[in-house]
Design a protein with these regions (language model features):
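Short glycine-rich phosphate-binding loop at a beta-alpha junction
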Residues: 77-85, 249-258
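Anion-binding (especially nucleotide phosphate/pyrophosphate-binding) glycine-rich loop
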Residues: 71, 75-107
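Acidic-glycine-rich active-site phosphate/pyrophosphate-binding loop
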Residues: 31-40, 91-105, 142-148, 203-211, ...
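Flexible, glycine-rich active-site loops centered on histidine and acidic residues
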Residues: 133-167
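Short beta-strand segments
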Residues: 11-14, 85, 115, 140-146, ...
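Buried hydrophobic positions in well-ordered alpha/beta secondary-structure cores of metabolic enzymes
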Residues: 10-12, 38, 68, 79-82, ...
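Claisen-condensing/thiolase-fold acyl-transfer catalytic domains that form or cleave C-C bonds
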Residues: 58, 62-65, 69, 88-89, ...
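Condensing-enzyme catalytic core mediating Claisen C-C bond formation in acyl metabolism
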Residues: 1-53, 156-228, 232, 236, ...
Length: 338
């Protein structure tokens, strides 16, 4: 009889949200918008903002990772690898993962960053899972963290109403009980570069007086183009995961969608044939936290989950990047939930 297959299971979740809230009423004072317009088009009511000028993405990531390890009963020295998904690193280099490794005290871990915008956590989860499945590592921390408030133009109502700050982390460990990350589909289409980007700050447009004055170091978005592609991309990827694995909507306990826009989430759920009670949605409270949305959902719903629950994670981000994963949950929550 062959040995059971080793997969990578999520064994703990940790989250961090800055204490300061930016409400729709607050934004009404900054730009020409209103609460009804924002809620109707995005589903967002408030978002968290990291206001401390001495704190950055690595600090939020470290707090989420620390909570995750404490819940797992694992010490920092027992972590083999740290993967950080982010588009708002503390600095261009070194990698945010290096800073987290130091702040966490994970002296035996190596790691690096993954930049795939709102799909970043999904990509990092796949990468971490392969490190575990291969037998190379036993414990991999996968973190999604972004401080979007630092790259948002708060005079641009098309972007400032959408984004917030936060971090989430999961610990991946090997299992042979049939749970864990079971399948993934991922895609890239680089023709979307001009639809969603931070144009300046890299080697193409390094910082100059001109780039700063032109506000090219802030997020630039063609909202209509992104919405059109995101609706199709997330829904198609989620449907593909079901079809590849002989699953139907009623086999799925929860869809865990990237929290970009409530209308995109609803379209993905309809394509999968699942009801609203099967969808994790916290966008009203946090907005779009980019790479942190998926682990923040897992953190909010962790106590409701049961061993063997089928989850479908789906995301779409700048690039364009998109994909979906089938994850079978590996432990029982407390039964309380968010």
């Amino acid at each position: 009889m062959p040995d059971p297959k080793t997969t990578a299971a999520i064994t703990a979740v940790g989250t961090y949200l800055p204490p300061d809230r930016l409400t729709n009423a607050d934004l009404e004072k900054l730009v020409d918008t209103n609460d009804e317009w924002i809620r109707t088009r995005t589903g967002i009511e408030e978002r968290r903002i990291l206001r401390d000028p001495d704190k950055a993405t690595s600090d939020m990531a470290t707090e989420a990772a620390r909570q995750c390890l404490e819940k797992a009963g694992v010490g920092p020295d027992d972590v083999d690898c740290i993967l950080v998904a982010t588009v708002t690193p503390d600095m261009v280099f070194p990698a945010t993962a290096c800073l987290v490794q130091h702040k966490l005290g994970a002296s035996n871990a190596w790691g690096y960053d993954i930049s795939a915008a709102c799909s970043g956590f999904l990509y990092a989860l796949t990468t971490g899972a392969k490190l575990v499945e291969s037998g190379m590592h036993r414990r991999v921390l996968v973190i999604g963290a972004d401080t979007m408030s630092r790259i948002i133009d708060y005079t641009d109502r098309t972007t400032c109403v959408i984004f917030g700050d936060g971090a989430g982390a999961v610990l991946l460990e090997p299992t042979t009980d049939g749970t864990g990350l079971l399948d993934t589909v991922q895609y890239v289409d680089g023709s979307g570069v001009d639809s969603l980007s931070q144009p300046a700050g890299g080697s193409l447009r390094p910082a100059t007086h001109e780039t700063v004055e032109a506000r090219l170091h802030h997020v630039q978005q063609d909202g209509k183009a992104v919405f059109k592609r995101a609706v199709v991309g997330m829904a198609d990827a989620a449907a593909e995961i079901l079809e590849r694995n002989g699953l139907e909507g009623n086999d799925v306990r929860y869809l865990v969608p990237h929290q970009a826009n409530l209308r995109i989430i609803d379209a993905t759920a309809r394509r999968m044939g699942i009801g609203p009670e099967q969808v994790m949605v916290n966008i009203a409270r946090y907005g779009n936290t980019t790479a942190a949305t998926l682990p923040l959902c897992l953190g909010d719903w962790e106590d409701r989950l049961r061993h063997g629950d089928n989850l479908v994670l789906a995301a779409f981000g700048g690039g364009f990047t998109w994909g979906a994963s089938w994850l079978k949950w590996s432990y029982d929550g407390t039964g309380q939930g968010t």
